[in-house]
C-alpha cells in the first residue's frame, strides 16, 4: 500500500501559495491605503471535493490511482510488497516450473477523497502614502477519506496443493500465510510500522502566516492611458500543518519552510470602463530540516526505523497571470488566467536510501481561469452616499490543465472594510 499523502503532498505548496492571494495587500491591483488607515479582511474559500488530480502527463486521474497495486509475481519480486513476500516469490522460482509457481495474490485499490476549505483573516495598514504593510493567515480545515478494496483470485493455496510434498515446511508456511492476504492483513502490516489512521484524517488549524508590504506608482505612456504598477515583497512563515511521515493520509496545508516572495502587477486603463494587465510572482523557498521516512529501495511502506531528519531543498514558486477588468461605479468584474508553478524538491540525509522516491512528482504546475465580481462602496462613502466603506468580492476559479497538481476548483467570498484610528 502506497502512502496516499505522497500523492496528496502536491497540495502543500500550491494550496499555501494560492491561499496567500486572499490576504489584504497581496491581491493584485487593489491599490495602497491612505496613511494611517487600517483595513481588515475576512474571507472564505471552499474547494470542490478532491477525488481527481493531474498526473505527469497532464491527464486527470483518481487520486488513489497511483497506488493501485497488483500483487503479482513481478511486483513481489521487486520488493514492493514487503521482504517476506519477496523472499517467498524468489524461492518459488527455484521450485518446480516457474510458470506454475508464479504468485498472483490479488489487486489492491484505494479510493481517496479530500475536502478542503480555508477562512482568511488579515489586516493592512497605510504606513505612509507610498507604503502599505499587511499581515494575515488562513484557518484551514481538511478531511481525507480513504477506502481500501482488495480483490482478485489468490493462487497461493493452489500452488501449495500443486507442489504437494515438494514444499518444505518454511515454504508451506509462507504459502499458507500468503493465501490469507486481505485488507485486514495489509492494514495490520501498515499499522505495525507506526503509521497513523488509514481510513480517515481530519485537521483544523492555522495555515502559514503571511507578512509583507506594498508600494505603487503610475507611469503615463500617453495622454489618458496610464500604467499602474504595484510591487509587494512578502514573507511566508511555516505555521501551518506540514506533511507528517507517520500519518498515512494527511495533507500538507502549510509549506513547512520559510518562503520569501516578490510580486509585481501592471494595469493599463484602456477606457474608463476597461483595463488589462499582468501579474508576476516569484518566491524563493528556503531549505528546512524535516522528518521523513527514507525508503531503502522502491518499497511502498517504509519501516518506522527509517524515519530520520533530512534536509529539504524545496524548489521555488512562480506565478504568471493575465487579467481583464471591467465595470463602472461600485460594480466591477474581472477575468483572469494564471499559471502556478512549483519547481521540484530535493531531499538529502545521512542514511543511505532512495531519496528520489520522496521527491517524486514534486515538480507541479496548475493553469487556472477565474471570474470575479466585486462591489466597492469606498468612493460612495467618501461622497456620503453610502453608510459603510467596504469591498465585497465573489470569485470562482477553475482548473484548465495541470502537471502533478490538484484539480483545484474553488469558490471564494471576501469582505474588506476600513478603520481610521485618527
Q: What annotation goes with each model-predicted range?
A:
Residues 55-77, 157-173, 183-189, 288-422:
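Outer membrane beta-barrel transmembrane domains
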